[in-house]
Every structure is written in C-alpha cells, then in structure tokens.
C-alpha cells in the first residue's frame, strides 16, 4: 500500500516537474535570445559608432586637402606675381645704371685729364668731384675776365680821349669854335716861317681842329703814366688809342713840320757855335 501510494504520488508529481522544467527552459531560451539580440544590437551600434568617426575623419581630411590645394594654388599665383615684380624691378634698376654709366662716360669725355689707354678709368665719385672743381675754376676765370673787361672798357673810356674838351661828335658847335693850343716847336716853326710860308696865323685853328693835339703836348709836366685802371696803363709818349686821334695828319702839315725841324736844328747848331 505504501509502495503504491508512493508511486502514485511520484506519478502525480511528475507532470509538475515537467512543467517546471519546460518553464525554466523556455525562460532560459528567451533570456538567451534577448541577450543575443542585445549583443547584435550593441555590435551594430558599435559598428555604426566606428563607422561615424571614420567618415568624419575622411570628410575632415577631404576638406583639409581641398583647403591645402587652394592654398597651394594661391601660393603658386603669389610666387608668380612676386617673380614678375622682381623681374620688373631688376629691369628698371638695370636701365637706371646703364643711363648713369652713359652719363658718366659723357662727362669723362669733356674732363681735362689724359684719355690714354694707360690711364685708369675714373670712378663716379672722382668724376663728379673733378667736374665740380672744373666748373668752379671756369666760373672764377669768367668772373675775373668780366671784371678786367669792365675796368678797361667800362667807365674808363673817357680817359682814352685827349684833353678835357670832348670830341666834335658830341658837341659840334663847341668843337667848331674851340681853338686848341699848338706845340711850342710847331708854333716857333710856323712863326719863323711866316715870311716864306704862304700859311697865315688864321689857318692854325683850322689845322688844330683837323687833328686834336695830344694832352701831353699841352702839359709838359704830365706824369709819366696815366692810370686808366688796374689792368691798363697809358704811358707817356704813346699815341692815343682812340680812333679819332689815330687820323693821319694832312700832307702839307707833315711836309712843313719836316722842313722847319731841319731848319731849327741848323739854327741851334749855329747858336751853339
């Protein structure tokens, strides 16, 4: 009886065990399925997370590459512009130096120094200093020449003319009425030869007006030299340099003076005896 009851109880209890086993197995299977599902989701999310930084990095790299290419193009353009600017500056400087060398060569050609092949070419500074000194020397020489010419031909031209009475060109009425004194020798010769000479005393003023006498003939006590300026001296005994005083004497006056001078010399010899 006891054995039967135990078997019955064991049989009665066996469906519960099966149900419990099945429930536990189903729960484990469901849990495993959830875990596998969660693992797949997490792996998918991890893959997505891994893919996202790669894409961002690739995008950033592409953007940086584009910017670097733009910068390189801009840099290349700027280098070309700088090269063109350098070429323009070098050409302008080369032209300036060429023009300067041509100007210096032209200045050296007119400088007063030896142009032989053995002479070393002057530098630019030496050429400019030599040109400055040469210009200063020419300027001082020109000023000195102007001063000398002004002293000779400037305000001292009146000293060239004879006597204190002006020429007949300035005052024709006064020159026609002026009576110039005659040299003592010429006056003595004319007075001694009045008996034999057809000339009269009234003709003497006419002779004097033809050729004005020298101031030395009027004043015997004239100093040996008349200062006409610092660069010119009019020595006694020399003829007047003006054109009016250089007129030749009349032929009858020159013949008369020669004959009378010979006559006076003979008379002086007789007096000495």
From Swiss-Prot:
<feature type="region of interest" description="Disordered">
    <location>
        <begin position="1"/>
        <end position="72"/>
    </location>
</feature>
<dbReference type="InterPro" id="IPR036638">
    <property type="entry name" value="HLH_DNA-bd_sf"/>
</dbReference>
<feature type="compositionally biased region" description="Low complexity">
    <location>
        <begin position="1"/>
        <end position="14"/>
    </location>
</feature>
<dbReference type="Pfam" id="PF00010">
    <property type="entry name" value="HLH"/>
</dbReference>
<keyword id="KW-0175">Coiled coil</keyword>
<dbReference type="GO" id="GO:0046983">
    <property type="term" value="F:protein dimerization activity"/>
</dbReference>
<keyword id="KW-0539">Nucleus</keyword>
<dbReference type="GO" id="GO:0010468">
    <property type="term" value="P:regulation of gene expression"/>
</dbReference>
<comment type="function">
    <text>May determine the distinct specification program of class A neurons in the dorsal part of the spinal cord and suppress specification of class B neurons.</text>
</comment>
<feature type="domain" description="bHLH">
    <location>
        <begin position="84"/>
        <end position="138"/>
    </location>
</feature>
<keyword id="KW-0805">Transcription regulation</keyword>
<dbReference type="GO" id="GO:0097476">
    <property type="term" value="P:spinal cord motor neuron migration"/>
</dbReference>
<feature type="compositionally biased region" description="Basic residues">
    <location>
        <begin position="24"/>
        <end position="34"/>
    </location>
</feature>
<keyword id="KW-0804">Transcription</keyword>
<feature type="coiled-coil region">
    <location>
        <begin position="69"/>
        <end position="90"/>
    </location>
</feature>
<dbReference type="InterPro" id="IPR011598">
    <property type="entry name" value="bHLH_dom"/>
</dbReference>
<keyword id="KW-0238">DNA-binding</keyword>
<protein>
    <recommendedName>
        <fullName>Oligodendrocyte transcription factor 3</fullName>
    </recommendedName>
</protein>
<dbReference type="GO" id="GO:0005634">
    <property type="term" value="C:nucleus"/>
</dbReference>
<dbReference type="GO" id="GO:1990837">
    <property type="term" value="F:sequence-specific double-stranded DNA binding"/>
</dbReference>
<dbReference type="InterPro" id="IPR050359">
    <property type="entry name" value="bHLH_transcription_factors"/>
</dbReference>
<dbReference type="GO" id="GO:0021520">
    <property type="term" value="P:spinal cord motor neuron cell fate specification"/>
</dbReference>
<dbReference type="GO" id="GO:0000122">
    <property type="term" value="P:negative regulation of transcription by RNA polymerase II"/>
</dbReference>
<feature type="compositionally biased region" description="Polar residues">
    <location>
        <begin position="37"/>
        <end position="47"/>
    </location>
</feature>
<dbReference type="InterPro" id="IPR032659">
    <property type="entry name" value="Olig3_bHLH"/>
</dbReference>
<dbReference type="GO" id="GO:0021522">
    <property type="term" value="P:spinal cord motor neuron differentiation"/>
</dbReference>
